């Protein structure tokens, strides 16, 4: 066996070696990484390898299977490995700092990689990152009633638990004052149409208000995102001192469990089907729908309660609708009424994770699609699996960013 094949075999064995962490990308956790930084001594996925190529003074990459590896380089990889290198470069990652996963957008991955290896922010002797009390700067914000993005000044007052923004630099007062306890932030790059697009949501007069913002700098928008997360963690820590930090971190911000177009009819099931953009919020157990993906407010929402409370998801369309061009669909039944939905387009049918979700008050919704709807659409199971406890006794109403009393997200336990 030649050196090339022998060293390739050694590398493939290293990928599966127990106690090394090499079986997953050192940066995003993707399984079965096929690339490696032979200057850092880590195994990474194809997507993250593209980021590493941008700073060759710090990291140099090779394909594990396709490139030639000499003996000394393989020895270096053997001596290091993912867990050992992560212990060095991730020694002091703040609890609020978002660590991206394989499914996250590229700007989060890129800034995480640069923060670790280029700026060395999380090393033991690195610069201390603390949750700043205040942050101020300009972001491009989409107008509420049009598609134009305008430059707006945002001010975060973390200690006061407020985020404000101004339409004029020298305005008399803020256009909006947002309470951190009601705020969520999630990157929505494809929906916004910008690689740095961030969606900020908060409660306003019983509705969910959406702000769509971006910044030209990837570092700046990710810094804003983590500043909001730091403020959220400060709020959660003060509001729920009995809970350990490890249980609060998953509640800081959240991504939608699923988003996409479907068509729905009304509670009488005689109304025409209308195409709507749906967003499934597992943490608040709500299915929101919009006329357009970038609307400032939802058109309506359905709370997904438990089956014991009278909520149900039926994997079919009512008889009066079945037999038209829509061959299958979903009906969401609530104690008050029912609604019918049909999914759009065909390729999304298998991806709506309905099973974990069903909770408080809503209506019946019906969805359909000619290709049929498999079991993976059942919302009740997905939500019920995650929400099996109640809010702490002293708190009522929309605590922790909006859970009603009697319902709480995964991780919170009954404290009474």
Which residue stretches match the model-derived regions?
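Canonical RING-type zinc finger of E3 ubiquitin-protein ligases
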Residues: 30-40
């Amino acid at each position: 066996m030649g050196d090339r094949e022998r060293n390739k075999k050694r590398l493939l064995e290293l990928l599966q070696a127990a106690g090394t962490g090499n079986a997953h990308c050192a940066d995003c956790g993707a399984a079965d990484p096929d690339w490696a930084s032979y200057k850092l001594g880590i195994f990474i996925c194809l997507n993250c390898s593209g980021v590493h190529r941008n700073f060759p003074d710090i990291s140099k990459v090779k394909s594990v299977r396709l490139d030639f590896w000499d003996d000394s380089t393989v020895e270096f990889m053997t001596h290091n490995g993912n867990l050992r290198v992560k212990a060095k470069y991730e020694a002091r990652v703040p609890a609020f700092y978002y660590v991206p996963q394989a499914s996250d957008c590229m700007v989060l991955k890129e800034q995480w990689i640069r923060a670790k290896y280029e700026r060395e922010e999380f090393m033991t002797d690195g610069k201390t990152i603390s949750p700043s009390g205040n942050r101020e700067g300009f972001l491009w914000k989409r107008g509420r009633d049009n598609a134009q993005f305008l430059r707006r000044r945002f001010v975060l007052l973390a200690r006061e638990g407020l985020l404000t923004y101004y339409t004029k630099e020298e305005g008399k007062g803020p256009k909006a004052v947002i309470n951190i306890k009601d705020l969520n932030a999630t990157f929505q790059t494809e929906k916004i149409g910008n690689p740095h697009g961030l969606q900020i949501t908060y409660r306003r007069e019983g509705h969910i208000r959406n702000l769509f913002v971006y910044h030209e700098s990837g570092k700046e928008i990710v810094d804003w995102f983590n500043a909001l997360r730091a403020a959220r963690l400060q709020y959660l820590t003060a509001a729920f001192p009995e809970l350990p930090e490890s249980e609060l971190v998953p509640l800081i911000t959240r991504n939608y469990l699923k988003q996409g177009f479907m068509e729905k009819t009304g509670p009488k099931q005689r109304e025409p089907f209308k195409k709507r953009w749906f967003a499934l919020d597992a943490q608040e157990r709500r299915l929101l729908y919009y006329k357009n993906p970038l609307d400032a407010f939802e058109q309506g929402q359905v709370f997904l309660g438990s089956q014991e409370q009278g909520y149900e998801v039926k994997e079919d369309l009512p008889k009066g609708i079945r037999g038209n061009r829509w061959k299958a669909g979903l009906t969401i039944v609530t104690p008050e009424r029912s609604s019918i939905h049909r999914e759009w387009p065909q390729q999304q049918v298998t991806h709506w994770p309905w099973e974990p979700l069903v909770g408080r008050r809503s209506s019946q919704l019906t969805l359909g699609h000619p290709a049929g709807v498999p079991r993976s659409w059942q919302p009740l199971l997905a939500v019920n699996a995650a929400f099996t406890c109640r809010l702490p006794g002293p708190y009522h109403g929309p605590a922790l960013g909006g859970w009603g009393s009697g319902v709480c997200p995964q991780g919170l336990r009954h404290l009474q």
